[in-house]
């Protein structure tokens, strides 16, 4: 434990928190242009073809972003909105594409959790 004199000479250092999504630069979302759209396989023990996009952001970063939902219309040169949020079984994928905004369309025929996928309200209700 430091003495009062030591505290006068050297103040306590506050530990700086490291952000989990540095490419957003403290913004809730960022716009970017897709440079490559492809599928990749998850870590063990999972097995799938996960849809991801390489996106060049307005902040200057180029990141890998996951495209959630069933089916998408994103292709190269599509302008998309990116939010934070990693995909646990895809190493290096720390961002999500926001469905239903800019060039990314919402998921069709989605009944539940529509707000997360930009789905339109069904006609029957």
Curated annotation (Swiss-Prot):
According to its record, what are the GO cellular component terms? chloroplast; small ribosomal subunit
Keyword list (alphabetical) reads: Chloroplast, Plastid, Ribonucleoprotein, Ribosomal protein, RNA-binding, rRNA-binding
- For bias kind Basic residues, which ranges apply? 113-125
Which GO molecular function annotation, any one, does this entry have? rRNA binding
Compartments reported by the entry:
Plastid, Chloroplast
Give the GO terms filed under biological process for this record.
translation
One Pfam family name is: Ribosom_S12_S23
Q: Where is this region: Disordered?
A: 104-125
Q: Record's superkingdom?
A: Eukaryota
Family, per entry: Belongs to the universal ribosomal protein uS12 family.
Write out the function statement from the record: With S4 and S5 plays an important role in translational accuracy. Located at the interface of the 30S and 50S subunits.
Summarize the subunit comment.
Answer: Part of the 30S ribosomal subunit.
What name does this protein carry?
Small ribosomal subunit protein uS12c
């Amino acid at each position: 434990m430091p003495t009062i004199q030591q505290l006068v000479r050297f103040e306590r250092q506050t530990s700086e928190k490291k952000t989990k999504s540095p490419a957003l630069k403290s913004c809730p979302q960022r716009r970017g242009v897709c440079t490559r759209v492809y599928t990749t396989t998850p870590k063990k023990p999972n097995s799938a073809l996960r849809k991801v996009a390489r996106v060049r952001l307005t902040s200057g970063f180029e990141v890998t972003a996951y495209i959630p939902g069933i089916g998408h219309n994103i292709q190269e040169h599509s302008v998309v909105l990116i939010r934070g949020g990693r995909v646990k079984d895809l190493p290096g994928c720390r961002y999500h594409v926001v469905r239903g905004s800019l060039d990314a369309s919402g998921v069709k025929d989605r009944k539940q959790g529509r707000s997360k996928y930009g789905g339109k309200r069904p006609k029957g209700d």
